[in-house]
Amino acid sequence: MEPPEGAGTGEIVKEAEVPQAALGVPAQGTGDNGHTPVEEEVGGIPVPAPGLLQVTERRQPLSSVSSLEVHFDLLDLTELTDMSDQELAEVFADSDDENLNTESPAGLHPLPRAGYLRSPSWTRTRAEQSHEKQPLGDPERQATVLDTFLTVERPQED
């Protein structure tokens, strides 16, 4: 009698078993309270075994962050920020004043700010509008303004 297909007598199926300790996974029942084994410690930061986490690049933090002060690009965030909130406006103004004081040359004093921030898009919009502005005395502009007012008026009721 022949064996069923796919199960030859000379074939031995063997799976390669990798010890769990090599993968960084503790064996069950070893009394290791579920903590991941630490392979090394670099700069005070524990690095887990390579089977769980592979660190390809290591870099230093860009800057330290305190609980009260976070540095980010203010110009991008001012469009999304409600500047009518007085406390928030003061925080932005304070951080902007600090930047001006550190960047100004000795002997020169920065001009006081009015308490608002400008973003590049606001500046661009104002610059574009100033190119498009026509003097108020221009008859063409006055006709446009009058047409606008005439179309907005309510019809008189009889």
From Swiss-Prot:
The modification Phosphoserine is found at residues 95, 119. GO terms for cellular component: cytoplasm. Keywords: Phosphoprotein. InterPro entries: Dysbindin (IPR007531). GO terms for biological process: regulation of signal transduction. Residues 125-141 have a biased composition (Basic and acidic residues). It holds the Pfam family Dysbindin. Residues 1-50, 93-158 are annotated as: Disordered. It comes from the Eukaryota. Belongs to the dysbindin family. This is Dysbindin domain-containing protein 1. It comes from Homo sapiens (Human). The gene is DBNDD1.
